[in-house]
Amino acid sequence: MGMTITEKILAAHAGKASVEPGELIQAKLDLVLANDVTAPVSIKELEKASLDAVFDKERVVLVQDHFVPAKDIKSAEQSKIVRDFARKHDITHHYDVGDMGIEHCLLPEKGLVVPGDAVIGADSHTCTYGALGAFATGVGSTDLAAGIALGEAWFKVPEAIKFEYEGKLPEDVTGKDLILHTIGDIGVDGALYQSMEFTGSAIDDLSMDGRMTMCNMAIEAGGKNGIIAPDKKTIAYVEERATRPYKVYTSDPDAKYARVIKYDVEKLEPVVAFPHLPENTRPVSEAGHVEIDQVVIGSCTNGRIEDLRMAAKILQGKKVHKNVRCIIFPGTQAIYKQAIKEGLIDIFIDAGAAVSTPTCGPCLGGHMGILAKGERALATTNRNFVGRMGHPESEVYLCGPNVAAASAIAGRIVHPREVE
């Protein structure tokens, strides 16, 4: 019996010829990631254990992104813990104010994750890197601490679900719409502890930015990881950035899947997820009259240059509705600079939007766009749980950047074509 791409990567990192679903393995790691929220917990435990050195100062990545620049004393103290640890252990890849970015936008951009890697991160959206053909998954601070010290982690090999997306994507349908449609179909626990393998002609047509959006939200269906086999687009992207050698894996023709789910993408339209779960999806044409108070465009899901270009194309020459606050935050400093170079930031500001430094802030209800009681936000982020972006009696709706930009103009949730 053949193996899936995820099984092959895990087998290689466990030093085994093969693995099968349900098997417990100890795997060597290529990269261990943490941020200003999750790292301090691990650091305190490592200091209690008198850690002399991290397993590899080149393979531990610390990204200050959740509360950066620090919003209050507590967040400043957390950042200092990370900063001091990075200096003490001479961590090569520590990203702080000025050179930071949202971690899951930053690492691919820096070439720190490559095809065939095994990566853990103390952030649930670490699964983003599956778009590069890597096994990447989120862990808690205990497993993170072990990873920092030893460069290893244990896993139960997940079953796999194969998702086949066939047909040509309609003009207004994005990778965000594909993954929201999928989560709406299978539910937020539809892929619980399973590998979500995205395939098909529609995936082939997606840009790398679109693929990262899809893999980013695998966790929202309960997935252990999301993954897309590398192709020419992947290799072209990686070759420009890779900081080390890599190995490409693909699934065998006779690999075993728990399920195979097929979608005809030509029938799809832009999707909106209603409160309070990403599975509560509707085509935007069926959204009804939903007025909004705030629009957020950015995050590790949709803060890449393609997303900003899409939003700018719609906002150009128009104005954000008088009752809407529109906040746009590029995923990294490099993306921010590229957006300036292309004139996108001018378009956003002229339209009446606020542009933020790269941060996770509003996505987790941390800062830079908190919702008050009774307010509604439409966001290109990845979660819309109760109280996710502020008051527990606020509401969050999820969508792609084109729907977000159009709705910012209209003051209510609309199809992008309604504001052309």
From Swiss-Prot:
Uppermost EC category: lyase
Query: What do we know about how this protein assembles, alone or with others?
Result: Heterodimer of LeuC and LeuD.
**Any one Gene Ontology biological process term?**
L-leucine biosynthetic process
Q: One Pfam match, by short name? A: Aconitase
Q: Which cofactor does it need?
A: [4Fe-4S] cluster
| One Gene Ontology MF term | metal ion binding
Could you identify this protein by its name?
3-isopropylmalate dehydratase large subunit
Q: Which amino acid positions bind [4Fe-4S] cluster, per UniProt? A: C300, C360, C363
Instruction: Please give the pathway this protein is involved in.
Output: Amino-acid biosynthesis; L-leucine biosynthesis; L-leucine from 3-methyl-2-oxobutanoate: step 2/4
Q: How is the cofactor bound?
A: Binds 1 [4Fe-4S] cluster per subunit.
